[in-house]
Amino acid sequence: MEHIITPKVENVKLLNRYTEKKSALGTLYLTATHLIYVEQTSNTRKETWVLHHHILSVEKLLLTASGCPLLIRCKTFQHLHLLFQKERDCQDVYQSLLRLFQPVKEEELYAFLYNPHQNEEERRRGWELISVVNDFNRMGLSNDYWEISHINKNFEMCSTYPSILGLPKSASVATVTGSAKFRSRGRLPVLSYYHKDTKAAICRCSQPLSGLNSRCVEDEQMLQAISQANPNSPFIYVVDTRPKLNAMANRAAGKGYENEDNYSNIRFQFQGIENIHVMRSSLQKLLEVCSMKSPSMSDYLTGLENSGWLRHIKSVMDAGVFLAKAVCEERASVLVHCSDGWDRTAQVCSLACLLLDPYYRTIKGLMVLIEKEWISFGHKFSHRCGHLDSDPKEASPVFTQFLECVWQLSQQFPCVFEFNEHYLIEIHDQVYACQYGNFIGNCQKERLDMRLHEKTFSLWPHLLENQHQYRNPLYRRSLESTVLRPSTLPLHFKFWCGMYNHYDRGMHPKQSVLDTLLTLTQRQVEGERTMTELQRQLAVADGVLPDPAGPINTHADQNNQSEKMPAPPVVQSNGSCAPLINGNVKEVGPGAENSNQEDREEPAANEHDLSSKDKPVFVETEHSKEEVQESS
């Protein structure tokens, strides 16, 4: 609170970027964790809550005849354009926010203050909810070819890797140690995913320190061990996710990529995904297009094309599809790396896992995938998300791109994902919120040093407790398949309005056919549940038992039978849910009965209509529960 100069400012106008007529007048509050704007109207009271950690930038604009404007941009793509009557108030809020949204130390992050009213046992169980070892066991490890190793238990071999690794059983300790020394930052080749049916594996690492002509016998033996761990293929793919020109430039700096002359039985492949700086610039250009007030169609489409954003999404998707096809169709193992193996490598490996394994398309499965491929393998969340006041050139929307790839897949396969887009958006918001400890720090070792398991809480129990909000009513377990084969033709990539225009209240609400279908299926399930309950109450009142062969049970039996239909081996992207989308909403996917009906007319998720003006108001947001007492 010592950083807050003025905790309350009245008569602040919240401007609407689409039309001046819809601008609001209200009171601005600053707390230790949130900026709160209370909009006063004749009939309702709306509150907009913005977590300080969500703020990307605060810009004080030139003084105008109407007042002093302040523009707040958020990492969640929310914009607040405030207009103060007094320049002094604007300056005080500006100075306060500069200190509040850019903490210097990890201990100042929200997670170290937040308490969801859990005891220590609940906290411990929350952190143990997701286990990478359990996921390895689910894949079938340990087996004749792969083993779970504790060789990095003290992080001495690689400080940015997890303490538990999947390694080829035939690789000796000397081979593993020598390979680690030959790889950038010690990030040696280790197991990411094992396909039990084809016995092919996806492995990940960083670039070799090969330079122009260096080689390492142990590293060559390591790749040979990976190849021998798959009896169904005589070779492995080595996939460098970088553009070839970038990889060649790194060779001059003593790094680079594998020389095929030195490694037996490898097939090398470049994928051409750009670096973090290009991606950061691309997103900035995309957001500039989104912030245009009244663009022409030509300007909008030109701006979208010039941003290159969807082109980059396609590049990541192409690489993931290549890995999935290699593992599933060619039955070949794949080794993936970029420069350090914690950005593009994480994107591609996790996307391939999602295509290959239906478990990762469930609500809990996606948590496991993020924990395994991103958190434990050292994606630098604190740097990439700008949690602290650090080098802005380290920030990049790498994880945002992965979430968008998942969303793009859900658009092609609307019935094979247990979760909806709100789940992806919630995860994205929580990554930047720092409300929970999962995404604080850059690697597992840093998190242990900060004792996050003792001082903060895990996000995953919170998401599971509220999973009814994130269920996809179209999800059909009967459509689970071994592998997804999405089309990566340009026409299949869409602009994700739900993410980048999530907070734009000025946009005209337009429901898609899918949204309408979701609403209808949810209403149907709610109606059936109500009818079942009324039937039960009537039977109790009459003193008889409900008829087990009644219409409700018959309908439920029909649904159960439909869910037991055999699944096809592969789901193509051309209309897996065509019967439902064409109007047949009779069948409802599992979990739909837990879905809440959405009202598209309601304001954004962090706005609340409150009618009470004199008594304390309890406001529950997606990031906190706080009590606000309005002075009379």
Curated annotation (Swiss-Prot):
It comes from the Eukaryota. GO terms for biological process: blood vessel development; phosphatidylinositol 3-kinase/protein kinase B signal transduction; phosphatidylinositol dephosphorylation. Coiled coil: none annotated. The active site is at C338 (phosphocysteine intermediate). Residues 126-500 form the Myotubularin phosphatase domain. Residues 545-632 are annotated as: Disordered. It is an enzyme of class 3 (hydrolase). Pfam families: Myotub-related (PF06602), PH-GRAM_MTMR6-like (PF21098). This is Phosphatidylinositol-3,5-bisphosphate 3-phosphatase MTMR8. It comes from Danio rerio (Zebrafish). The gene is mtmr8.
